[in-house]
Regions:
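Terminal substrate-recognition subdomain of acyl/acetyltransferases
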Residues: 2-19, 123-169
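Short, solvent-exposed loop/turn segments that connect beta-strands within catalytic domains
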Residues: 16-17, 78-82, 95
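A short beta-loop-alpha structural element at the N-terminal edge
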Residues: 20-36
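Helix-loop element at the rim of GNAT/NAT acetyltransferase active sites that forms part
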Residues: 36-52
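Active-site rim helix/loop that mediates acceptor-substrate recognition in acyltransferases
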Residues: 48-78
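Conserved beta-strand in the GNAT
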Residues: 73, 81-91, 98, 103
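Acidic/histidine-enriched, beta-strand-rich ligand/metal-binding domains
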Residues: 100-101, 107-110, 130, 141
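Conserved acetyl-CoA-binding loop-helix of GNAT-fold acetyltransferases
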Residues: 104-124
Length: 169
């Protein structure tokens, strides 16, 4: 936005070429944010499903996946309560990286935050990523990030089957 009268006030997030970001493990106090953003964004991307039923049934799926996985938060480095993005996933020993869901706030999209969160899981370029959920951006990222959509991972024992080596790519 340009103004003939004055320049916009300096905004360190917008005006820096690098976000002041810290990656930390999610804490119990982050759970409500993760649940609400996961459910809302997933429901928004699946408008053909009844919203009430999706919320009720998917809450159990999210709880199971979060209990068996790791959730990491991308936060402002000097204020760990200012959350930019989060990712729930699991690095399977001698197996693929499982990513259940990644959420980036609108204002911070296309700034490399999802890549930063993938680095927490020691993702290597070209390595396959198993996705238990698929959203709008899946198709555009599928080839570049070697994504494989496997919704069966959402089953109660789905994560365990990858962890135990019963399911492989």
């Amino acid at each position: 936005m340009t103004s003939p009268y004055a320049t916009l006030a300096y905004n360190p997030i917008r005006d820096n070429d690098k976000l002041p970001v810290l990656v930390r493990l999610a804490s119990p106090s982050d759970a409500s944010l993760v649940y609400s953003t996961w459910l809302r964004s997933y429901a928004d991307q699946n408008k053909d499903q009844h919203r009430g039923i999706l919320y009720k049934s998917h809450r159990k799926i999210i709880r199971n996946l979060m209990e068996k996985s790791v959730t990491v938060m991308a936060v402002m480095d000097d204020d760990p309560n200012q959350i930019f993005a989060w990712m729930c996933g699991l690095r399977v020993e001698s197996g693929p990286l499982l990513v259940h869901y990644c959420y980036v706030k609108d204002a911070f999209r296309r700034l490399g935050l999802a890549n930063l969160l993938l680095k927490y899981f020691e993702h290597r370029q070209g390595e396959p990523i198993i996705c238990s959920h698929k959203g709008y951006v899946y198709k555009s990222l599928r080839d570049r990030y070697n994504l494989f959509y496997v919704p069966q991972v959402r089953e109660p024992l789905g994560v365990d089957k990858f962890r135990d080596g019963k399911w492989k790519l």
